[in-house]
């Protein structure tokens, strides 16, 4: 304390520290404002332009509308909604001469598959002048084929995988594992069959028979839809509805497909409108953001329960 100016020195250091802290806080404030403004700008831009398909920039000449069917057919993927939305957009465009559904899916929900099947049939009846064809890429099996059978024609590559007209419901039983671990299952129900399919309770023959009856019912709906869509083109083969899959080159003589073709060749040679315009809805950034942090949060548990209890066309 020999320095007579020590008080002034301390005050200067305190003031300097305060100014430094204020500058640091201001920089962070500016940073977060920039982040929020950028996010808002992206969301607004995406909402205005993100969902608009390529047809808005297409020429006035006639074109072939393309709609993509990719991945598992499920509510999480919004497969049915996107397909139906794409169909509506394609039909509403006065320049659409024909529609191609580019299929690459292993199947999925029988409910959603049937919903899209019915919508394609409805739109075909409403717009008979606009054909709807399916072009199979790698695979179009089970629920995907359910949908494809509603089209005017199905085109494949010789190495495509097609078919699997069947229904599957799988799961696991944990009763023996629970017994070894000393875990006791305590389950109360109101209704004698409320616990049907419970993986933690012993499986009963009556439960299996009931589940098989449900699967047979869905399978029969699938078969009738394929027969309705394909008609006399189907070959009378006992294995046709057994759940087997075939190569593209095998599917044509069986009547499951009509010929070979790609998106480009079908647009050019069948629809006669070589320009292909993608009408596949993508969803804007806001939709994807909400889906990622909303629906996807519970999709793991939901998918697991579906595997245990819900039949799948695959």
For the regions a language model picked out, list residue spans one by one.
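Extracytoplasmic ligand-binding site segments that recognize negatively charged/polar headgroups
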Residues: 164
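N-terminal organellar transit peptides
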Residues: 1-157, 168-314
